Swiss-Prot record:
Keywords for this protein: DNA damage, DNA recombination, DNA repair
Keyword DNA repair assigned: yes
Function: Involved in DNA repair and RecF pathway recombination.
NCBIfam families the UniProt entry points to: reco (TIGR00613)
Gene: recO
GO cellular component: bacterial nucleoid
Record SUPFAM superfamilies: ArfGap/RecO-like zinc finger, Nucleic acid-binding proteins
InterPro entries for the chain: ARFGAP/RecO, DNA_rep/recomb_RecO_N, NA-bd_OB-fold, RecO, RecO_C
Domain of life per record: Bacteria
Pfam families attached to this UniProt entry: RecO_C, RecO_N
Organism: Lactococcus lactis subsp. lactis (strain IL1403)
Protein name, as recorded: DNA repair protein RecO
GO biological-process terms attached to the record: DNA recombination; double-strand break repair
Length: 251
């Protein structure tokens, strides 16, 4: 065990025994850790340890079991994520993806910062689907997946249009479409936007407008990539998918 200070982003909590809780926090300095909080309801830090909060932790870090919180300060609460069910669903999904992408205790300040910035953009009102798509695509390499959407897999031509081939795990230009008769037959704009999303920095992201039908095409393509190459099935993703028809009902 060692005492330390670190920034931490609360991923989730769950009940443990009668009055205690386990709180999973993605720390900047020590990766994802499970913290034991005794008598959670009476803890002075209870409000600071809700999901979608970020703060400075003073803690005892234990590599072989539960860690323990000594103090929480400089707390940031993502209020819009907490209050809007649609934003909340997207945030819950990307948090689940981050949790699945690396092992517990694995030091990864890059992913911590990427997740934090993604949540900030969601909370600020940036397009939920766009932020989520960017996160999904850029976290793929944490699962060991590296896909190139910027050039043809055969001739390396960098000017589209392109289609995607699961057979070759890459793009095809029109001159090489015949190499895979079962290619995806995508709208060329899907590959263009997916390549943009894979390369863009969140700090450079501006307000952009994408039509609903194009968002659906991108969604279906990314789902296909995850089914083919990653193979995880998250409850938060299933819930998010089930919300597709809610918007009109709740108007």
């Amino acid at each position: 065990m060692r005492d330390a200070e670190t920034q931490g982003l609360v991923l989730y909590s769950r009940n443990y025994k009668e009055k205690d809780k386990l709180v999973k926090i993605f720390t900047e300095s020590f990766g994802k850790r499970m913290f034991f909080v005794k008598n959670f309801g009476k803890s002075p830090y209870a409000s600071s340890l809700q999901a979608f909060t970020d703060g400075k932790l003073t803690a005892t870090i234990n590599d072989g079991g539960f860690s323990f919180i000594e103090d929480v300060s400089e707390v940031v609460v993502y209020k819009n994520i907490s209050s809007d069910i649609f934003i909340n669903a997207h945030a819950s999904y990307i948090i689940s993806l981050a949790d699945a992408a690396i092992s517990d205790n694995q030091y990864d300040p890059g992913l911590y910062g990427f997740l934090k910035r993604s949540l900030e953009l969601l909370d600020q009102g940036f397009d939920m689907e766009v932020v989520t798509n960017i996160f999904e695509l850029q976290v793929l390499h944490r699962f060991g997946i590296s896909l190139n959407f910027s050039e043809c897999a055969f001739c390396h031509k960098t000017v589209g249009p392109f289609d995607f081939s699961y057979k070759f795990s890459g793009c095809l230009c029109p001159q090489h479409f015949d190499e895979d008769l079962r290619r995806s037959h995508l709208d060329p704009n899907v590959i263009y936007l997916v390549n943009l999303f894979q390369e863009i920095s969140l700090d450079e992201l501006k307000k952009i407008s994408i039509k609903a039908d194009m968002k659906l095409k991108i969604r279906q393509f990314i789902d296909g990539l995850y089914d083919e190459y990653v193979g995880i099935h998250l409850k938060s993703k299933k819930f998010l998918d089930g919300m597709s028809g809610w918007a009109d009902i709740m108007k």
